[in-house]
């Protein structure tokens, strides 16, 4: 489980709130699954503070984007990530999402980071799907690559991603789990068919004033009250006809593939 990432609104929480979220998740489910805590902040000091806290509470690993807002060079990002790995004796996962950070991880910097024994993997959310292939080939079989873009999950797995971390998984986990199940059985064509059902649903989630509000709305309609996202992300009313229809369409898609 990936905590306080983009969909988890980590950047909209202050440091103490992020610590509380991470600690709550570890206490509730840390015995059943590995918890990766995203600790990236606009500055290195607070990122390191969160990394140390993640180790203290028993998280399995940390992860971080580059510092945001300022357009930093590779050496600055290298030192930022290295400082985080030194702040906690935990595996570290690079988070590459250039469309939000304005920093695209080069192979030169990636190879430098691979020299750090605590760098265990990467969440690859960059647009070119072939980045997954490049990072996996350079990192080796034990290096973990997470697919980021939900709309290419099946393709990302085909290119070498070991798993995925995505923003819409919570709204329709059964469909992503079905893709994994089919891939594990070697039924790639059927996995692609499920992806073809999933992708239009993703686009519809993203058509609302905020995807965060829509995802929380779908989960709330399914019986787990989520509340509203934190501003400036806008909420979506639970009685919004578009949201209700989307909820029913997700359920229909799940029913369609249930016995595949």
Question: Predicted segment positions?
Answer:
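Alpha-helical hairpin
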Residues: 13-14, 105, 238-239
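A general structural signal for well-ordered alpha-helical segments in protein cores
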Residues: 18, 22, 47, 81, ...
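C-terminal alpha-helical cap/extension of soluble enzyme domains
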Residues: 161, 168, 172-260
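Active-site beta->alpha loop and helix N-cap motifs at the rims of alpha/beta catalytic domains
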Residues: 1-102
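Catalytic alpha/beta core domains of metabolic enzymes, predominantly
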Residues: 86-87, 98-199, 203-207
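Alpha-helical structural signal in soluble globular domains
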Residues: 20, 24-29, 53-57, 83, ...
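Secondary-structure boundary/capping signal
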Residues: 33-34, 92, 121, 143, ...
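Glycine-centered flexibility sites
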Residues: 5-8, 38-40, 58-61, 76, ...
